[in-house]
Amino acid sequence: MRCKVQLYLCGKVFDEIVEARDYQDAKRTALARNPTAKVIGVTAVFG
């Protein structure tokens, strides 16, 4: 499924769209792309 992961880094909040199996996988993928960021939230994206 496609997930939107909200990340926080250096005072900014930004979204990372990832293809993942579940929410934990989405978090891992987003953190692999942005290792120093903090995950704020994960939501499924449809459409």
List each language-model region with its residue ranges:
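Short aromatic-glycine-(Arg/Gly/Cys) micro-motifs in beta-strand/loop hairpins
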Residues: 1-14
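Compositionally biased, intrinsically disordered low-complexity segments
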Residues: 8, 21, 42-45
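Generic detection of short hydrophobic beta-strand segments and adjacent strand-loop junctions
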Residues: 16-18
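Short, mixed-charge low-complexity intrinsically disordered segments
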Residues: 32-47
